[in-house]
A protein has these predicted regions:
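Extended, low-polarity transmembrane helix blocks
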Residues: 1-43, 61-69, 73-154
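Short juxtamembrane and helix-loop transition motifs at transmembrane-helix boundaries
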Residues: 46-58, 85
Length: 154
């Protein structure tokens, strides 16, 4: 049993080296996805405004510009790993609002029918945002460079 615990501890230590490369991959992929969705919204702002109007979102034109900018610039910030936790928070909130307004049925069926929640469009974006919010950007990020420069832990 002692050997098994030692091997487990050793394996866990080695696997922990994958944390930063994994977070980099998450940030690069999902950051790019956010950039693309934001860019698409920016170039179809009248459609997005109309869609927001159909969902009874207040100030639809303002919110169309706000959401498209948040997704585009938030995606860029994720890619470079700057202000990652704050960006993750804003993007996660954005995805929760997307659930609430566009996929409300999926959101309220979280416990009764989780499959509906998981297959809704905002899910993977929400999950990636929460990962960055909770785990941070990792070592391969501007956040880590700033933290080293300021001698603080991220």
């Amino acid at each position: 049993m002692k050997h098994l615990l030692r091997y487990y501890t050793l394996a866990a230590e080695k696997i922990s080296y994958l944390r930063s490369p994994f977070l980099l991959a998450v940030r690069l992929y999902w950051g790019w996805q956010f950039v693309q969705t934001g860019w698409g919204k920016m170039h179809n702002i009248s459609k997005i405004t109309g869609f927001f109007m159909s969902l009874n979102i207040p100030f639809p034109a303002f919110n169309a510009y706000f959401v498209s900018g948040l997704e585009f610039f938030g995606g860029l910030l994720l890619i470079i790993g700057f202000a990652s936790r704050f960006t993750g928070l804003l993007l996660a909130f954005n995805m929760l609002v997307a659930y609430w307004t566009a996929d409300h049925e999926a959101l309220v069926s979280f416990f009764s029918n989780p499959g509906k929640f998981y297959v809704a469009d905002p899910y993977t974006f929400l999950f990636a945002s929460l990962m960055v919010l909770i785990l941070g950007a990792g070592l391969f990020s501007v956040d880590a460079l700033v933290a080293r420069r300021l001698e603080v832990q991220v």
